């Protein structure tokens, strides 16, 4: 049944539910399509796993942390002893030292204009997703590198007439190798060495590292520049290591020497801002890192 509009009001105005009665301004919808949100969140998470941190897999990582900090336990060495017949078993009295790791929140956000995807030839969502993944991945590595910097043991002054400015020489590597062994660092396949790209080039000049006569065809570094196993250690180049003047810090460590804590994995929040006609994409995470055992670095 058709109803007539009240006197003095046109039917067009009476049947428009999107018009503000006080100001005469159309109400703008502020919701974003759920399919777009879900697709974007998936892209960010997958990109972080693929393109993110290089160092996180090399350290002891704890996920699902509740609170602003967590504790990693460092246990001392035990000593075995004998006992008399029917006597008491000697007690090792292992030292337990808690190492607290503080977490911090990190963000990587950017804007996506509603009409940008109609004007550009590339996938803007993929670009923002990759950029956020790289930023968060670099921050994870920065936290781990800062924890490595807290260690104090250094392999310096190796070889007669050599200085720290001579690059990464075989003598320095062997000195560090001896220090790892003297400290009883387990040779269990969980040793890692992270060096700069210049130092990676120095390694390629060492026959024992790059010559098939020493290491065989399967371990040649020329097949890929990401990582290579040598001396029971996985070696990898990294561009974000600490630079002190002209000296690049390189690190040789055991996985259990560094602790990495995760309170929140990479998350994505997308909100619509009508005054900008754009979405703001905020990628965020909560993480921290700490030096657990200085002897292991």
Q: What are the functions of these language-model segments?
A:
Residues 264-297:
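H-loop/switch region of ABC-family ATPase nucleotide-binding domains
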Residues 226-271:
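Glycine/small-residue-rich hydrophobic helix-like segments
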